[in-house]
Amino acid sequence: METAAIAAWTFVSECPIPDDITPLLVDGEQPWAAYKTFRDSAVFTNKRLIVRDAQGLSGKKVEIYSLPYASINMWSSENAGRMLDFNSELELWTRAGHIKVKLNKGVDIRKLDHLISHAVLNS
């Protein structure tokens, strides 16, 4: 099922949950895990995926994507191969469109798959 992605992100490594995510959370929302992206971070909460994208030379301009788990219709995960295929990939089909998430070597695709499964199936 090949469709053009409306967004593509790369998760570089797991990281501590950023302190400055708190103002973005609603009552009852708890952060579960965070990942460093090329330009900022992505945080999985119990309600949604929040991806921050710092822009410009100073990084003061920040675009924030918020993807509620209820909008995810389907997802797939692909683990890395052996020889030349080092990256894993997570794909999300949502009401807004198709989103690709590339995962650098060392990011646990099965942990992410479990996190998405738990969030989507319990939303």
What do the predicted segments below correspond to?
Residues 24-41, 45-98, 114, 118:
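Phosphoinositide-binding peripheral membrane targeting modules
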Residues 1-42, 104-106, 110, 118, ...:
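Anionic N-terminal interaction surfaces
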